[in-house]
């Protein structure tokens, strides 16, 4: 396949055209007065979204060089979304502004490598300044404000997320699901819940609710199958003497062992129930260990030289209550020591930081939530499926932004924080490095300009008003059209979102600026196929 090569200004200009087209599609969604983008789907109804990364992912350009530029900035949006959960439109708008401003200077003769070095120094100083002016999130009111802004000024979503975080804590898992009605709902499951139900309906104690309810039970944890009753007898005899209920969590319980447990339950000899251990393979072992730490027990494991026959009451965990239905088991108020639980939580956090797999990260976060004290489920309601999907995207964004705010703190929102931080950064640079720093400073106005423009205000006037103000909390409220104290007005952004958006935007823009050649496949115009031979149509000779 023949290749097409472009050099220097020709290459960069065509890359810029792709970046511009992507930016033009994404930037209209920015701010509280941002517009919707309608996206055609290969099947079904088109989707409507105000989510920057959803728009960016759909942009594929016909020209291969332009598409290379667009795909690099598309990666900026996607990476920002993965790292911070929000700020995708900010990152796209910044990347375009930096590339546009940089291209003008490089075309005029500036050295792109020196320009890049100056840009990197300016960004490092800006990030330090953002951290200096950041405030810690102090309560559910600020959490609600952050979530509201990220959900495109939907206060009901902000309140839902604030309530969810208040109930399960900042490390708790909050999941988003589609509701079966048009109303939004918040359901909270306290304690540790895992997706395994009772092994036999004969264990049920509450026939009305069809669930097993155990009060102050002992909890036996075993990492293998239990088939032989003889292995279980010693611990069952000890349990019977205490008169307390027993929950057995094992890989499986079958045959003679399960039948005997059911008979003893029905005869009232033992108040007992059994469930399969959650997860598979190594994850099952880890989750059994989590349950052991939460309940103050030990996992009876043959790998550690322990047999089921050797189990004593000291090896068993305890909890204030256990509720089991056909699908789930919930352990409430485990008797484990707080120091041991905290150590386990820190261990899982370290694993989350190290893993590169999204799947592993998700499963580790689920384990973290179960240990931290609960799971909240936000059920999003809407009148139509299209509206439901759009709203669910906004809730996901708001949830990610809220977590980012709790993690690194908050700064003034509405595109003002980057401008205010840049006024406080004074670097002693010269030559093309100084040009690089100035390119970044100029580009930092772009998010505020776009927010004002989308809201129907004069972008130049708004940007200038914020730039000349000496008040670090000063900014523009695009909803009311007023200049306000942004913290008092509740217009705030997570530092992490601003930081990640800026870092990723500068990273890709500087790569584009230092590009000196592009190589792409040359699209060949294929000739039209020849008309087929019509010789077989002799029977039509009578036509005039």
Swiss-Prot record:
It comes from Campylobacter curvus (strain 525.92). GO terms for cellular component: cytoplasm. Its EC number is 5.6.1.7. Forms a cylinder of 14 subunits composed of two heptameric rings stacked back-to-back. Interacts with the co-chaperonin GroES. It is found in: Cytoplasm. This is Chaperonin GroEL. The keyword Cytoplasm applies. It catalyses: ATP + H2O + a folded polypeptide = ADP + phosphate + an unfolded polypeptide. Belongs to the chaperonin (HSP60) family. InterPro entries: Chaperonin_Cpn60_CS, Cpn60/GroEL, Cpn60/GroEL/TCP-1, GroEL-like_apical_dom_sf, GROEL-like_equatorial_sf, TCP-1-like_intermed_sf. GO terms for molecular function: ATP binding; ATP-dependent protein folding chaperone; isomerase activity; unfolded protein binding. ATP binds at residues 29-32, 50, 86-90, 414, 477-479, 493. Together with its co-chaperonin GroES, plays an essential role in assisting protein folding. The GroEL-GroES system forms a nano-cage that allows encapsulation of the non-native substrate proteins and provides a physical environment optimized to promote and accelerate protein folding. The keyword Acetylation does not apply. Keywords: ATP-binding, Chaperone, Cytoplasm, Isomerase, Nucleotide-binding. GO terms for biological process: protein refolding. The lineage of its organism: Bacteria, Pseudomonadati, Campylobacterota, Epsilonproteobacteria, Campylobacterales. It holds the Pfam family Cpn60_TCP1.
